[in-house]
């Protein structure tokens, strides 16, 4: 009987590993489409609408899946003033680690991280509509559900603390750190996001924080893109 229970537990965790991998692949469809359309020099407006439409489909699947499996309710009725203070403080900590990482990049004669360089190239050659969906919606919702939802709560169920650590490492690795500065930037970001989800026991809180981070980054990138396209400058 005990062996049967252990076998069932292994099968259940294995099922969630497969779900994690399938969900990750699904989350990459919008950016894959954006890269494909940019490579084919598809009209910017139409490509933005296509990527936006696909992103909405992916988001619906993720949100429904998270609600059905009780990873998140996406009901913000719990949100209070102290939660706003937590988000502000968390953002400032991430900003500080990003600043430290950026200073170290300068000292090593590098301008930006490998991940940011790829992102800049995508933004320059894609619609701002695509960038908005990918940065502000797809990345925060999908990455948080994967790294701070499925990994700690399902795959490591019963050992959530270990699961949060693994999820934090996976998140950092997904952003392709190639040197110490990029490890500080993405490792710091991942640590704060993980702490937020763990401490509040609300995946919605880390999603909100992630959205704020990427939303501010999107606004800055959009401004640079508009300057670049109107004045013929590059960044």
Give the ranges of each region predicted by the language model:
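Short, Lys/Arg-rich, polar N-terminal cytosolic tail immediately upstream
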Residues: 1-10
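Juxtamembrane helix-loop-helix connectors linking adjacent transmembrane helices
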Residues: 39-45, 71-139, 226-235
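Transmembrane helix-loop-helix hairpins at the membrane interface
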Residues: 3, 96, 125-235
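Cytoplasmic juxtamembrane interface segments
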Residues: 59-79, 204-205
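Membrane-water interface at transmembrane helix exits
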Residues: 31-39, 63-71, 101-106, 142-143, ...
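Alpha-helical transmembrane segments in multi-pass membrane proteins
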Residues: 13-69
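Alpha-helical membrane-inserting segments
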Residues: 26-38, 61-62, 93, 97-108, ...
């Amino acid at each position: 009987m005990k062996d049967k229970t252990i076998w069932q537990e292994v099968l259940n965790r294995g099922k969630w590993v497969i779900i994690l991998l399938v969900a990750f692949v699904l989350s990459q469809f919008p950016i894959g489409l954006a890269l494909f359309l940019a490579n084919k020099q598809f009209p910017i407006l139409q490509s933005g609408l296509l990527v936006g439409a696909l992103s909405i489909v992916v988001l619906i699947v993720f949100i429904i899946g998270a609600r059905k499996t009780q990873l998140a309710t996406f009901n913000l009725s719990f949100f209070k003033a102290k939660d706003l203070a937590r988000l502000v403080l968390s953002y400032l900590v991430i900003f500080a680690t990003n600043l430290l990482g950026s200073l170290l990049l300068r000292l090593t004669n590098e301008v930006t991280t490998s991940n940011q360089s790829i992102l800049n190239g995508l933004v320059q050659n894609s619609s701002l509509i695509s960038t908005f969906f990918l940065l502000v919606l797809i990345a925060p919702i999908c990455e948080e559900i994967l790294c701070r939802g499925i990994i700690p709560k399902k795959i490591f169920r019963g050992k959530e603390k270990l699961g949060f650590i693994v999820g934090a490492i996976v998140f950092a690795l997904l952003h392709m750190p190639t040197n110490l500065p990029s490890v500080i930037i993405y490792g710091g970001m991942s640590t704060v996001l993980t702490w937020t989800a763990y401490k509040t026991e609300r995946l919605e809180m880390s999603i909100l924080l992630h959205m704020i981070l990427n939303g501010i980054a999107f606004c800055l990138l959009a401004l640079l893109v508009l300057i670049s396209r109107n004045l013929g400058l590059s960044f």
